[in-house]
Amino acid sequence: MDTSSVGGLELTDQTPVLLGSTAMATSLTNVGNSFSGPANPLVSRSNKFQNSSVEDDDDVVFIEPVQPPPPSVPVVADQRTITFTSSKNEELQGNDSKITPSSKELASQKGSVSETIVIDDEEDMETNQGQEKNSSNFIERRPPETKNRTNDVDFSTSSFSRSKVNAGMGNSGITTEPDSEIQIANVTTLETGVSSVNDGQLENTDGRDMNLMITHVTSLQNTNLGDVSNGLQSSNFGVNIQTYTPSLTSQTKTGVGPFNPGRMNVAGDVFQNGESATHHNPDSWISQSASFPRNQKQPGVDSLSPVASLPKQIFQPSAQQQPTKPVKVTCANCKKPLQKGQTAYQRKGSAHLFCSTTCLSSFSHKPAPKKLCVMCKKDITTMKGTIVAQVDSSESFQEFCSTSCLSLYEDKQNPTKGALNKSRCTICGKLTEIRHEVSFKNMTHKLCSDHCFNRYRMANGLIMNCCEQCGEYLPSKGAGNNVLVIDGQQKRFCCQSCVSEYKQVGSHPSFLKEVRDHMQDSFLMQPEKYGKLTTCTGCRTQCRFFDMTQCIGPNGYMEPYCSTACMNSHKTKYAKSQSLGIICHFCKRNSLPQYQTTMPDGKLYNFCNSSCVAKFQALSMQSSPNGQFVAPSDIQLKCNYCKNSFCSKPEILEWENKVHQFCSKTCSDDYKKLHCIVTYCEYCQEEKTLHETVNFSGVKRPFCSEGCKLLYKQDFARRLGLRCVTCNYCSQLCKKGATKELDGVVRDFCSEDCCKKFQDWYYKAARCDCCKSQGTLKERVQWRGEMKHFCDQHCLLRFYCQQNEPNMTTQKGPENLHYDQGCQTSRTKMTGSAPPPSPTPNKEMKNKAVLCKPLTMTKATYCKPHMQTKSCQTDDTWKTEYVPVPIPVPVYIPVPMHMYSQNIPVPTTVPVPVPVPVFLPAPLDSSEKIPAAIEELKSKVSSDALDTELLTMTDMMSEDEGKTETTNINSVIIETDIIGSDLLKNSDPETQSSMPDVPYEPDLDIEIDFPRAAEELDMENEFLLPPVFGEEYEEQPRPRSKKKGAKRKAVSGYQSHDDSSDNSECSFPFKYTYGVNAWKHWVKTRQLDEDLLVLDELKSSKSVKLKEDLLSHTTAELNYGLAHFVNEIRRPNGENYAPDSIYYLCLGIQEYLCGSNRKDNIFIDPGYQTFEQELNKILRSWQPSILPDGSIFSRVEEDYLWRIKQLGSHSPVALLNTLFYFNTKYFGLKTVEQHLRLSFGTVFRHWKKNPLTMENKACLRYQVSSLCGTDNEDKITTGKRKHEDDEPVFEQIENTANPSRCPVKMFECYLSKSPQNLNQRMDVFYLQPECSSSTDSPVWYTSTSLDRNTLENMLVRVLLVKDIYDKDNYELDEDTD
């Protein structure tokens, strides 16, 4: 039922309603007792309305016919608006029963007309929640003849909490719960005895919290009981909401101030923003334009009504035009309407009516709470498929009925940039960008411009931190340094020019002109006359204001004086009285004390205001150890925000290499908001206001709140595990670095340095960082990343003063024993039982004109002699001349004794190249050909660096007396290497080769035998691939050789002895014959092609002649040949080989060399560096292809690398490649940045149990830290992954089937060959191999990490292996194990 309905009774499910069988009326009998309150005189008469109680739990109510009242009955009875209140701890007394009116009441009420009654259940109340619930004033409309007899009581909705309004103010009602709170707004009755209650008995309930409010409780009479003389009229029970439209005439009559938007005037009372409170504090408003975002509501202000706009007149219909609603009495359980004369059942203490006992027993008194959609407010309690989402970066989750509501809510929370801050101005009503938000009286007013802001301020009579001349807003009280005291009032200005203009114009601000039209009848501020007379501060003489001399007074404000002499005399008098005055013990201002506090030591402290008392108490509790009192110090620090002086431990803010100090945490927070000190929070990764900066393992981490700091600490501690400790010296959370036991207590430290410093402090050997004295250091603070210790708070404050203004007396160190004794004496005096009063400090002298402090210095300190070197002789300066004298060596040169004035010869060595003959041993059969070969080599001049290096090696010939076959020097220019005869033995194909030679097959092509049955990589499936490299490389153009001759017949393929043992899992059987045959094909093509094109970096005037037999070449020759081979090799049809095919051919060449007992490794040895560089350039251009089944196509497989010993633990480089391959395959590290993030501290061994076989297996775990940040590259998607605390965990499980290829065994071998001090480091994983290490060496690696270029070359080759792209590879291996 709407609250504006007249003549009706509104009852909810919590309203006790007893309908008697003979009278259908609501009893007001003993209202006070029914809610466990005191008996009200209005209703507690002797037994006039008292009824007998029935002890039955369930009551039976009979419903009788009801007739509507006649609409034309006049009103004669007196009416009053009465308020009933009840306490919070009310309990229900008595039982509900059927109501039987007394005989006296029946006689007096005979013939009265019954009223229409509507009884709504709780569902009706919930359906009306969308209607307007907030009304500020309830004024009952009455006939003119009863106007003077009506008492108006205002009920403000501001006293209700938001939750309670939503819960209970949809339809007002009465509750019978024991802990409920009731407010009866209007109780209207036709009984004559009720109207005679005095007004003094009414209680005002404004400002009290309550759950429910009853707008009307009406006593209705029955038609059978007699007629009431004056009857009933609907207007007597109506509630009319009146609004006031301000006009010029109304303001003139009531004496209201100037134009005031948002005010309402009713019956002469001034209402501001919907409330009737007056302006107690002139600074009670807050401007949010500087500290709060414009589109965000100020925290802590929770008003029930929206932003007030200019009032508009609302048409109020008359009482006779308001319709009434029909009768609707339904069962609370089955919702069936109750017929006339039907028996109704009611439970004791409940307001619900039921049609039967079945409904009465099955009805639940407290229904389950309903869930509403956040956006559309739809009931979603029983709805399926609701959406729960976390929106607007909040910690709570919201529930929506559909995705459309979610989208609308997100759009509402995140509006577009253009309409981000557009709202309607309170003054002008324009929908535009808001510049100011003023919170006043629990109402937030939005103002679009400074013009509207000044109009609002002047209209409401608010005092603010604005310039008195131009009206410019000052962010804080300390921002306006230009202050004038005129007639005892302080006036602030933004600059000195405004001060001058204010003096000239005569104290009339210029911005008042904007609101002059609205200030016609205002008495708040009248313009003053030009040249106003002002009283001199010294002699109290009246002088013109602009002739006065201004000077800063002892309180820090500008004071006017008539002359300079008067100013000096007043200062002299004030200086004498100041020493005898009372000074505030906190801010040190000389003012009249408002508060006095007796401290535990018996001293009486004076304070100027309550703010100083609160700050002094808070800071004393923080700085006092174990609750002991600490006497205030004479040293004063200045807060960087409020500019007040204080003598306690300051709050420190380190920002942009500057340290700011504040008197309290509040000033520090306000300073951060005012100066926009924002940073990215280390935990939530959002740009917010800086809360605190904490060190973690020596790294400063900023946080936006205390919650983010605690959550980051938990993640950090969980990541380090048992190694995470808190350093006892620097108090940072870090990994355990040192441990020290002191007096039976084991203490942990981050480093040995902290351990040593803590030990010095513990044994009182450390010195104070201020006075440099040893002893007990009670205070400590972290200053610019270092811990500072001090004797007490006095030294701490002196240290902070030295940072702003250096003090020469504190820089002398511990040698100043007299100063140390003085410090100890002063401390002893302070702790005595009867401390003497401290001497009056010297008066601080300042220059009047420029306000600079005089610098006092000792002259002798800066006078030091200037030392100069001067020769004693008068002759010219002797210059020493050096004459070289060549003397052959070895010759004995006698050196005589000499004096300092004589010249003596000094021997100096000068190296001179001398040719020395060297005899080279050679076999007898080739000694005759050596001179001819040497002459031929000397005649060759090469411009290529590689060829020059190869030609210089021919001067050294190895001896091999057991050789039976002569090497043809003309066919091969280079025969030997530095190693000597060992390589010559390896190059003999007849004596050392264990693999049969491969016959040349010109048409043998690997890409024809193993075609690429795959789709071309396009834009549609490119996103399926992981990132291959950290950067993109352009494919270098390679020359094409000419096609020669017709196709030859295909020869049957030759298979090696290892082909039968190929792994069945490989897609392509590995055959080294493809590589050897490609080499022979390239050598033949190179010899026949006279126009061979080579790369610019490998060009030479005379190239090395190569042979088809690979075993006949030395290391240098193979390096040169393979470098050209990978760039010039072509398929038999003349097309280019794919990069994976070239890598496959090189692997075949390596297997052929290993099978022939050749110990060269073309992929690892330093002698093949040129070939490795050229091969890496080719492999960078490889792009994988996708097969129809979604897998990646590549001709290189993992089994090939194990067969040719590229993977394994037989050498340091091979072990390093194996770890790199396993990390790429199982950890899913596809970029160099991801490999560099690995460290010994993030990879650890772990035991895992198989849930099927219950067998424990060792595994390596790598937990990717969420604190590393997100890379620009794609996220890791491959590998075994587990979710623990939302952090990806990757594992490498032990391979029990083949221990030689087990990743856990390889990692353990790598740890055993690494230095022991690197096992726990967090910044290195891949180590540089030791150059001089052998296979039997205990340590293979150094402590230096591999460079980025080496890791990138390793990654290029690993990414060509097909097995790393198989997602199910590791899971299958795990199951088979």
Swiss-Prot record:
Organism: Pongo abelii (Sumatran orangutan)
Regions annotated as coiled coil: none
Function: May function as a transcription factor.
Zinc finger map (MYM-type): 327-363, 369-409, 421-456, 463-502, 533-570, 636-671, 723-758, 764-799
Domain of life: Eukaryota
Xref: SMART domains: TRASH
Subunit: May be a component of a BHC histone deacetylase complex that contains HDAC1, HDAC2, HMG20B/BRAF35, KDM1A, RCOR1/CoREST, PHF21A/BHC80, ZNF198, ZNF217, ZMYM3, GSE1 and GTF2I.
Modified residues annotated as Phosphoserine in this record: S159, S305, S838, S958, S1064
Protein known as: Zinc finger MYM-type protein 2
Molecular-function annotations in GO: zinc ion binding
Region Disordered, residue ranges: 85-177, 273-305, 983-1002, 1028-1064
Gene label: ZMYM2
Positions bearing the Glycyl lysine isopeptide (Lys-Gly) (interchain with G-Cter in SUMO2) cross-link: 48, 88, 98, 104, 147, 253, 297, 312, 325, 348, 366, 417, 441, 491, 503, 513, 529, 532, 576, 603, 649, 658, 688, 700, 709, 764, 788, 812, 829
Keywords (A to Z) from UniProt: Isopeptide bond, Metal-binding, Nucleus, Phosphoprotein, Repeat, Transcription, Transcription regulation, Ubl conjugation, Zinc, Zinc-finger
Predominant location: nucleus
Keyword Transcription regulation: yes
Entry-linked InterPro entries: DUF3504, TRASH_dom, Znf_MYM, ZnF_MYMT-QRICH1
Location within or outside the cell: Nucleus
Any GO CC annotation of this UniProt entry: nucleus
Residues modified as Phosphothreonine: T1376
Segments of skewed composition (Basic and acidic residues): 139-152
Basic residues composition-biased segments: 1039-1050
Stretches with biased composition (Polar residues): 85-115, 127-138, 153-164, 284-298
